[in-house]
Amino acid sequence: MARTAEITFKEFRRRYNTEDACRAELFRLRLPNGFVCPKCGCVEYYPVHGRNIYQCRSCRHQTSVTAGTVMHRTHLPLTLWFWAIYLCATDKRGISAVQLSRTLGICYDSAWHLLDRIRTAMGQRDEKYLLSGIVELDDGYAGGPSHNGKRGRGTDKAKIVVAVSKTANSAPLFARMKVVDNVQGKTLQEIIDQYFVPKTKVECDGYRSYLNLEGVELNTKKYETDDLHWVHKAISNLKAFLQGTYHGRCTKLQAYLDEYCFRFNRRMTGNQIFLRLTRAVATSCSVLC
């Protein structure tokens, strides 16, 4: 079976049913060109039996397939990690820590830890990509119920900025979402500088904070609600995702946005999304280092 093909549930169970199989897959994904010592660059190593680590033949530096990733210093079996990755990747609705703990037979804290690290890898992976071409840009609000009864820009919900790139024929491509403290011009400019390719064509609703953005080709037309179809659809679907899976809670909202975008940006990959997410986890950077 080709590594790039979709992986079925049956194939997943067959391929990743042991610690050694999971470790070999992480080695392949993290070191596609073979072992390279992170300390001295030597390509020769030998395994330290019984400890699941590799030792450089030159400088004797020891490392593992999880060192320096979001799995750094994990005490959970790799098979549990792979199950969590598979369940998180293949369920379009996402999976909560409560459900994951029940499915895998682990405590809530372990399930929460797994999902938190996996979402971190999702966010890191999408940080590598910039939006280009034509991009719809708008701000919105997400999280639990508003306590002051207000809607729109006066609400007390968490503020988010959402961007969706699209083709010339208006087919959606990629999405980025960011939790922000405000939607002032300076904040929006920082998002443009971080997430957009220079000279990208931006469509927005004409709110004054958007009018002086630099580095992009800003369409000064005042777009109505129906004109920014994809960005508003993304915000609507995000709210349904948060409400359905996480019951609207705002805790670690940015991580939930990263999860939503990762899945949206790979919506055409079918079950390949599991392999994409496994690669993201294997090549991630530790939040502990």
Model region roles, listed by residue range:
Residues M1-C289:
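Residue-level recognition of single "structural anchor" positions
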